Curated annotation (Swiss-Prot):
Origin species: Chlorobaculum tepidum (strain ATCC 49652 / DSM 12025 / NBRC 103806 / TLS) (Chlorobium tepidum)
Gene: cmk
Name of the molecule in the record: Cytidylate kinase
Family label: Belongs to the cytidylate kinase family. Type 1 subfamily.
Coiled coil ranges: none
Keyword Transmembrane: no
Residue sites binding ATP per the record: G16, P17, A18, A19, S20, G21, K22, S23, T24
Top-level EC class: transferase
GO molecular function, one term: CMP kinase activity
Subcellular location: Cytoplasm
Taxonomic lineage from the root: Bacteria, Pseudomonadati, Chlorobiota, Chlorobiia, Chlorobiales
Length: 235
């Protein structure tokens, strides 16, 4: 027998700044709900990686229209939690620090946002999805049944990012917590001040401060909210 969550799948939009816990929360939540997880940040990182690999960054800084040609041929897809760019698994490559430094700029470009918005909206047509990013609740799915906006103190977010990088570094040097905190603060400024789809909370979004929360606590809060919405729809 199907549960209410399976009978009436909804769209869960999770927004927030870098390292606020969006992706981890969204992945675990989607698995728990039996929903599809779509990592929009990975999509922007994939475009950024392609720009860097093709050596187009300086050209695009001078002339943003140069990116349009690249977007015509790019393919981005997911298999489970693996990310594929033009058929290649780039799940680790898109997390490189050089990508992190440039993704805010690439994300600010209108042709990029238009192209990825189209892809993301197509992915969400069947509902039963959890999507995280920076403009999901405001631009991609403003009518999502549940919109969450995660925040956390920049210092705490830097510690999380540092721990994540150490885990993946295999003994290689990683940026200091202090350097990462400055990078995160700059990223916040870039995301909030960009012309196209700046980072902001939708008026209907539930604000959740994750500074002192574990991942399990974050997931439980959002899972309970999904249940409440589905139960109300079933009445």
């Amino acid at each position: 027998m199907e549960s209410p969550i399976e009978k009436k799948p909804i769209i869960v939009a999770i927004d927030g700044p870098a390292a606020s816990g969006k992706s981890t929360t969204a992945k675990i939540l989607a698995a728990r709900l039996g929903y599809t997880y779509i990592d929009t940040g990975a999509m922007y990182r994939s475009v950024t990686l392609k720009v860097l690999r093709e050596g187009l960054l300086d050209e695009i800084r001078k002339d943003e229209t140069r990116i349009a040609e690249l977007l015509q041929t790019i393919t981005i897809g997911f298999q489970g939690q693996r990310v594929f760019l033009d058929g290649e698994d780039v799940s680790e490559a898109i997390r490189e620090n050089r990508v992190s430094r440039e993704v805010s700029f690439i994300s600010s470009l209108k042709p990029v946002r238009d192209k990825l918005r189209e892809l993301q909206q197509e992915m969400g047509r069947k509902r039963g999805i959890v999507m995280d990013g920076r403009d999901i609740g405001t631009v991609i799915f403003p009518d999502a049944e549940l919109k969450i906006f995660l925040i956390a103190d920049p210092a705490e977010r830097a510690k999380r990012r540092h721990a994540e990088l150490l885990l993946k570094a295999g003994g290689a040097a990683v940026p200091s917590v202090e350097a990462l905190e400055e990078e995160i603060k700059q990223r916040d400024r870039d995301d909030e001040q960009r012309t196209h789809a700046p980072l902001k909370r939708h008026p209907d979004a539930v604000l959740l401060d994750t500074s002192n929360m574990t991942i399990d606590e974050q997931v439980n809060v959002v899972y309970d909210l999904v249940n409440k919405i589905v139960e109300q729809q079933s009445l």
